[in-house]
Each structure stands twice: as C-alpha cells, then as structure tokens.
Amino acid sequence: AVSCFKACMKKRGIPFVCSVDC
C-alpha cells in the first residue's frame, strides 16, 4: 500500500486521490 501510494504521488501529487486509487 505504501509503495502504491508513493508511486501515485509521483504521478499525481495529490495524497487523497492516491488513497482512493489504491
């Protein structure tokens, strides 16, 4: 989950959106 979140952060940079995606 953490690695997914970090990867999403690099793509979008929006934490709450990353949480929904993951």
UniProtKB/Swiss-Prot annotation:
Posttranslational modification: Contains 2 disulfide bonds.
Keyword Disulfide bond: yes
Protein's cellular compartments: Secreted
Organ and tissue specificity: Expressed by the venom gland.
GO CC terms in record: extracellular region
Sorted UniProt keywords: Disulfide bond, Secreted
Role noted for this protein: Not lethal to mice by intraperitoneal or intracerebroventricular injections in doses up to 100 micrograms.
Protein name, entry field: 2.39 kDa venom peptide
